[in-house]
Design a protein with these regions (language model features):
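Terminal substrate-recognition subdomain of acyl/acetyltransferases
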Residues: 1-14, 170-183
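Conserved GNAT acetyl-CoA-binding A-motif
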Residues: 120, 127-139
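Conserved catalytic-core motifs of GNAT/GCN5-like acyltransferases
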Residues: 135-140, 152, 157-172
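Conserved acetyl-CoA-binding loop-helix of GNAT-fold acetyltransferases
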Residues: 104-106, 112-127, 149-153
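Helix-loop element at the rim of GNAT/NAT acetyltransferase active sites that forms part
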Residues: 12, 31-48, 65
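Acetyl-CoA-dependent GNAT
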Residues: 49-98, 103-109, 126, 182
Length: 183
């Protein structure tokens, strides 16, 4: 799914844009993704799990997502740097077509700049235009207080908990929470 770019200001005054990634962005998107998953335990992968992903494969993935009517991926670009991404995946089956999944990732150096809020506002706006959509869903890992605060600010509420759903490298287990925002 393609949408028009959305320009906004960060809290520190810098200009940013949320836009669909182009195939030419693949290398920087891949670098950003690998960096983000290495900066936190609150995402579902480690950098070494993505080492085999090539720039060419990432470019194909970006193109496929952009062409899909049921997926939207946006990157946040700040002064030529891809600072994060967000996505929404609409279910197309009859029984689950009223649901969509949403996710975000932001480089640590860009935290507390309003990017997450801008991403969620954009994704919610897109979701509101989707006929028949009744709820947005996301998951977060226990301990992600910053993420949880953002999600709650955007109208999401916890509806379920999967005990010990995530096992970290140190062997510790964390619960995973499901949140829903009714449309």
């Amino acid at each position: 799914m393609i949408i028009d770019p959305i320009h906004f200001k960060l809290k520190d005054g810098r200009s940013a844009v949320l836009r669909n990634p182009a195939q030419e962005d693949a290398e920087q998107v891949l670098h950003m993704f690998r960096t983000i998953i290495g900066e936190t335990d609150f995402l579902m992968a480690y950098p070494e799990e993505k080492e085999s992903l090539t720039v060419e494969a990432e470019a194909e993935i970006l193109d496929k997502i952009n062409q899909s009517p049921d997926s939207l991926l946006l990157i946040c670009e700040v002064e030529g740097v891809i600072a994060g991404d967000c996505d929404i995946r609409f279910n197309s089956r009859m029984k689950t077509g009223h649901r969509a999944q949403i996710g975000i990732g932001i480089l640590k150096e860009y935290w507390n700049q309003g990017i997450g809020t801008a991403m969620f506002e954009t994704m919610i706006s897109v979701a509101e235009k989707r006929e028949g959509l009744l709820q947005l869903e996301l998951e977060f890992i226990e301990g992600n207080a910053r993420g949880r605060a953002l999600y709650e600010k955007m109208g999401f509420r916890i509806v379920a908990m999967k005990p010990d759903a995530v096992k970290l490298k140190d062997g510790s287990l964390r619960n995973e929470y499901t949140m829903i925002r009714k449309m």
